[in-house]
């Protein structure tokens, strides 16, 4: 059934009848209009006829009531109107304020967000401050790490200092983004470097092996140097200490300086070698295997070679000091030689026997000292010969030269030299030089000593000849005879005696054993034998005719330590 639609259609028809010009706007959609139309639909015809009159009457009544109400409530209406106007004004002002508020709401939102952020930060800071207050003791320990480490280093507690440095390193790895932690780590690193310098500086002092082991152990734990670098640092530091000890020795007295240098170098250098080998032990088998498998790759810093080079350098420095002090002059070369040989022998225990390197130095020094002594003897002989005179020279000693039994041969100088003071002074000078040489006479100098004396005797003969040429015009018979005796004493007393003294210092038997030749070969090669012919060549026309008797081979074999003088019978 379509009743609702049909009713709507009827209502529209009724409305057209009531409002031919259309329904007023104020009644459109009014539910009372619909209710009134529904009520009209229920009225009878008589009621419909009276409805218009009723409505007019009702309208008139309502109008009267409204007028009465307006008259009775006039003031109320005025007040209401004023209030309405006031309310309207307030609403307008409120609308303006709301518009202003709406325009400022974004800024307010931003400020609120900022306030919330600041509040959150303040809250976080307050929370951190609370945690800081609770963890105050632990934070103080962290903040005092640099001071604590500095105190440990100052007091020598390096074990604790290393633990603090390791803790600071771990702290920096985990909390490195915190500025305070970064500052603490930097301070600890600076103190770590100071400790490294202090440990290396301690190696430059007098240390025993346990202390050296401890210090190098700390350096290894610090991992500041590689193995070869650590070896180099150790040798440099110990070398600086050894050098300071040597530089502290007074240099005024060469003998004392050299003795102290030998003692200090021997003791301290041996200690350094012992310390090095204890700290850096070498596995020879491993080293040989590595060296055999490793190809050549340019220059490398091998620890063992580094130590050998350093030891070679120290020995070279000692040899330079030895040579310099010996050249300055020492009182007792044999004492220094004994100390040096003991020094070199003691180092054979560590495979560094360097006695062979000292031998040429001593040989050279002894040779120069002997040559210097002989030169002084030559100068003295020249001065004495210039003051010498043959006037009233009487032979006080016999000039007969006896055949001496080799078994009872003596090294006493010939008494005939006493008649001629220059020859006696020359002989005494030779004896002084040979006696000084005898205390420390290297076999390597046998030829040099013989050559030096040969040259000196040749110069003596030349000076005697010059003396003859200068004075011969004024010679009387007795003076000429005295000069012949002087020449004979030089040729047949002094020269054979010096030859015997040479063999006393350098026994032929010792030379034959050293050279691996026989006595006959030694004589044939003229080793340690003076060449009398060359010595006496300038004076041969002034010497009396003598028959020379050479020693027999059996005599030389019976007494190799005796000289083989060139003697003359009669």
Curated annotation (Swiss-Prot):
- The answer to whether UniProt assigns keyword Protein transport to this entry is yes
Report the principal subcellular site.
Golgi
Protein transport among keywords = yes
Q: Where in the cell is it found?
A: Golgi apparatus membrane
Entry-linked Pfam families: Dor1
Q: Which domain of life is it from?
A: Eukaryota
Which BP terms from GO are recorded?
Answer: intra-Golgi vesicle-mediated transport; protein transport
Topology relative to the membrane: Peripheral membrane protein
Q: Which GO terms describe its cellular component?
A: Golgi membrane; Golgi transport complex
- For this UniProt entry, which segments traverse the membrane? none
- Keyword entries, A-Z: Golgi apparatus, Membrane, Protein transport, Transport
The family classification in the record reads: Belongs to the COG8 family.
Q: Supply the PANTHER family for this chain.
A: CONSERVED OLIGOMERIC GOLGI COMPLEX COMPONENT 8, CONSERVED OLIGOMERIC GOLGI COMPLEX SUBUNIT 8
**Subunit composition and interactions:** Component of the conserved oligomeric Golgi complex which is composed of eight different subunits and is required for normal Golgi morphology and localization.
**Function summary:** Required for normal Golgi function.
Q: What is this protein called?
A: Conserved oligomeric Golgi complex subunit 8
Which taxonomic lineage does the organism of this UniProt entry have?
Eukaryota, Metazoa, Ecdysozoa, Arthropoda, Hexapoda
């Amino acid at each position: 059934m379509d009743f609702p639609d049909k009713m709507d259609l009827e209502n529209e028809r009724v409305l057209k009848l009531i409002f031919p010009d259309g329904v007023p706007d104020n009644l459109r959609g009014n539910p009372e209009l619909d209710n009134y139309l529904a009520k009209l639909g229920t009225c009878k015809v008589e009621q419909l006829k009276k409805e218009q009159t009723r409505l007019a009457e009702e309208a008139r009544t309502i109008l009267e009531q409204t007028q009465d109400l307006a008259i009775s409530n006039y003031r109320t209406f005025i007040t209401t109107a004023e209030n309405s106007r006031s309310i309207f004004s307030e609403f307008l002002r409120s609308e303006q304020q709301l518009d202003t508020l709406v325009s400022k709401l974004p800024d307010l939102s931003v400020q609120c967000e900022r306030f919330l952020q600041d509040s959150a930060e303040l809250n976080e800071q307050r929370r951190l401050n609370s945690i800081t207050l609770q963890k105050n003791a632990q934070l103080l320990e962290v903040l005092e790490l640099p001071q604590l480490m500095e105190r440990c280093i100052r007091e020598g507690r390096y074990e604790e200092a290393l633990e603090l440095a390791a803790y600071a390193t771990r702290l920096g790895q985990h909390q490195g983004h915190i500025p305070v932690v970064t500052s603490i780590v930097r301070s600890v690193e600076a103190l770590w470097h100071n400790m490294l310098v202090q440990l290396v500086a301690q190696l430059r002092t007098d240390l025993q092996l346990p202390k050296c082991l401890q210090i190098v152990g700390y350096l290894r734990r610090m991992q500041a140097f590689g193995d070869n670098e650590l070896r180099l640092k150790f040798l440099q530091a110990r070398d600086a200490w050894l050098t300071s000890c040597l530089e502290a020795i007074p240099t005024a007295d060469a003998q004392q300086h050299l003795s102290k240098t030998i003692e200090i170098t021997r003791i301290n250098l041996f200690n350094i070698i012992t310390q090095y080998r204890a700290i850096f032990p070498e596995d020879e088998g491993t080293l040989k295997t590595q060296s055999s498998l490793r190809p050549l790759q340019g220059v490398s810093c091998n620890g063992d070679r580094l130590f050998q080079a350093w030891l070679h350098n120290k020995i070279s420095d000692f040899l330079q000091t030895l040579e310099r002090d010996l050249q300055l002059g020492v009182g007792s070369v044999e004492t220094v030689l004994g100390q040096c040989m003991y020094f070199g022998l003691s180092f054979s225990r560590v495979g560094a026997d360097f006695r062979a390197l000292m031998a040429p130095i001593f040989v050279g020094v002894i040779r120069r000292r002997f040559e210097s002594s002989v030169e002084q003897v030559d100068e003295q002989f020249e001065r004495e010969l210039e003051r010498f005179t043959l006037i009233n020279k009487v032979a006080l000693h016999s000039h007969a030269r006896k055949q001496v039994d080799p078994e009872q041969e003596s090294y006493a100088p010939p008494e005939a030299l006493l008649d001629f003071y220059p020859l006696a002074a020359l002989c005494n000078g030779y004896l002084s030089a040979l006696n000084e040489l005898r205390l420390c006479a290297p076999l390597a100098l046998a030829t040099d000593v013989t050559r030096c004396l040969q040259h000196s005797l040749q110069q003596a003969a030349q000076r005697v000849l010059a003396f003859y040429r200068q004075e011969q015009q004024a010679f009387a018979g007795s003076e000429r005879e005295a000069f012949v005796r002087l020449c004979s004493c030089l040729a047949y007393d002094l020269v054979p005696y010096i030859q015997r003294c040479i063999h006393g210092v350098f026994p032929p038997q010792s030379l034959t054993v050293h050279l691996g030749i026989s006595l006959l070969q030694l004589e044939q090669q003229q080793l340690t034998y003076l060449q009398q012919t060359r010595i006496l060549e300038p004076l041969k026309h002034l010497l009396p005719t003598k028959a020379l008797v050479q020693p027999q081979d059996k005599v030389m074999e019976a007494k190799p330590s005796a000289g083989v003088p060139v003697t003359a019978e009669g």
